[in-house]
Amino acid sequence: MNWFGSNFFRCPEDLSLLNIYSPLLSHMSSEDEHFISNLRGHVPASAVVKQPVRGASGRTTITAIVQTGGGWSTGLFSVCRDRRICFCGLFCPMCLECDIARHYGECLCWPLLPGSTFALRIGTRERHKIQGTLCEDWLAVHCCWAFSICQVARELKMRTSQVYEICAVPMTKDTLV
């Protein structure tokens, strides 16, 4: 039986790739031989008993949305409710959309992507639990794009969210359970 046949039926624990002699390895430089011999003689690493802790700094930030539920605070065509948003939406709707993307922590290039306004509107509706459907959002964005951006901006301005920072005391001793 050849080498493959005799080693094929052995237990995987008995067979290590580092213990196999290969004729291809005989043409290696002395530096490579030294590296391979060190690997063959290397003792397996011990198990990790201490795992890294997420948020090792001890600080956690929690955003609490105070007002949720219901419908949109203003209608789609209620642009005159907030003059700043009205003028920004009229003269530079992309700037207003960049402001909304910044509010969500997205890149300022976000409004250049197709469907970004639709995603921002759905994100606002889902985050604040505003009643509505995807079909209504799609129609508002694709038929009344500038009005839709203004409505989302007004909603984000009217709905409040508070940011809390919680400090945790780090554990001093790790124990195995």
UniProtKB/Swiss-Prot annotation:
Any one Pfam family match given in the protein's UniProt record, by short name: PLAC8
InterPro entries reported for this sequence: PLAC_motif_containing
Annotated NCBIfam families: A_thal_Cys_rich (TIGR01571)
Entry's family note: Belongs to the cornifelin family.
Protein name: PLAC8-like protein 1
Source organism per UniProt: Homo sapiens (Human)
